[in-house]
Regions:
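Glycine-biased, small-residue-rich flexible motifs in mid-sequence functional cores and linkers
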Residues: 2-4, 83-369
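Short, small/acidic-rich helices and loops at N termini and domain boundaries
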Residues: 1-88, 274, 355-357, 362-369
Length: 369
């Protein structure tokens, strides 16, 4: 068990200026370990800084003092630390030159040998793409696969990936760009709690005292990519966090995958470009992901057939029949034609959408998927 003093020094490392992790580790070893690093005399420390061509002021004392407050936060918010020298530090993340020396986490780090897949994309995800993400994860589960899904808890594709993981009982990691004493965006707090309840984790390289800075969200993308065997871009414009994550993953030598989209769709242009530049493999369905991750089916693959009305309840049959005959239909008209109470109809439509049978469109309209 680590001493309070050792934990304090690990926290203090996260409060010092950032530079190359491998250089930091070599530097610490030259000082005789983390304790030597923090207690090396000022003159000798300055000499080492010059030798390593580093120029930051000696902030070790102030970092140690601030770390005392951070330790209180660890207890208060049930947050733990993982150092790059710990045996449970994620293997793939450790291989990255810019891996964090220490990161904070809540929940459980998966010790089981499972493939890690990052799923990223725009915050303005289309309903059609969200359904495709849900369907892909559902089919992977039906094939008997179990994965760790990594994303960033943001709106759009991120939260769809986390929710779909929870539905399929996959552990999922949410990598955050702020301290773990808060959840952003706030409406996702309940989902974050469900992630913890279902054996996943929230991760951040930032201490609780770290201010909420937009640049942190770009920095955290390298951790999403670094944790993962492959990064899957579901939907993205030409610029944005998902594209940055894809390029970082490629720079690490990891596989990148993307869903193609219509050329005129602004949030398909990024995916199409990744495929066109041979940065990403084209993904059409779950079998493509299984192939790229070298997964062997443990169960019979799901049948790629359209749904059968006779597999559903009477109310579902009514809704599906109307949508098949009429095409795009507003919810008010569905309620009128089926005589299903509005509150029951809303629940039924959500169920059908999650099953990938229908798609919701703006203005509370619905069509067959």
């Amino acid at each position: 068990m680590e001493t309070n003093s050792c934990l304090k020094m690990q926290v203090a490392l996260t409060l010092l200026p950032k530079f190359n992790t491998q250089k930091y580790l070599t530097f610490i070893n030259r000082c005789g370990g983390i304790e030597g690093f923090f207690h090396e005399k000022t003159h000798a420390f300055s000499t080492l800084l010059k030798e390593y061509q580093l120029s930051f002021s000696d902030e070790r004392k102030s970092a140690l003092k601030s770390a005392e407050e951070e330790l209180k936060n660890l207890d208060l918010y049930d947050i733990r630390l993982c150092s790059v020298e710990h045996s449970n530090y994620p293997f793939l993340l450790r291989q990255c030159e810019d891996t964090p020396l220490v990161f904070y986490y809540k929940g459980q780090l998966v010790t089981e040998s499972l493939p890690y897949l990052a799923i990223v994309g725009t915050r303005h995800a289309s309903e059609r793409c969200k359904i495709r993400v849900r369907t892909i994860l559902k089919e992977l589960a039906e094939r008997g696969h179990r994965l760790v899904i990594v994303s960033g808890l943001a709106y759009g594709i991120d939260i769809t990936a986390h929710l779909s993981s929870l539905t399929q009982h996959f552990p999922t990691y949410a990598v955050l760009g702020h301290g773990l004493n808060l959840i952003y965006p706030a409406p996702h707090k309940n989902i974050a709690e469900n992630i913890l309840r279902q054996g996943g984790a929230l991760l951040s390289e930032y201490p609780c005292s770290s201010p909420f800075i937009p640049q942190h969200f770009l920095q955290r993308n390298r951790i999403i990519a670094g944790l993962s065997q492959a990064t899957f871009v579901a939907e993205s414009a030409l610029k944005g966090g998902a594209m940055a994550t894809a390029h970082i993953a490629a720079s690490y030598g990891r596989d990148v995958m993307a869903l193609p989209g219509r050329p005129e769709d602004i949030f398909s242009k990024g995916c199409n470009e990744l495929i066109k530049q041979n940065i990403a493999a084209l993904v059409e369905d779950s079998s493509d992901i299984a192939c790229l991750l070298h997964l062997k089916d443990k169960k019979s693959p799901p049948q790629q057939t359209s749904f059968n009305f006779f597999d559903t309840g009477d109310q579902e049959k009514q809704v599906l029949k109307i949508l098949t005959q009429q095409g795009c239909t507003p919810i008010d008209e569905l309620s009128k034609n089926t005589r299903i109470a509005m509150n029951e109809l809303i629940a039924l439509l959500l169920k059908l959408e999650l099953e990938g049978k229908i798609v919701s469109l703006p203005g509370k309209n619905y069509i067959i998927s």
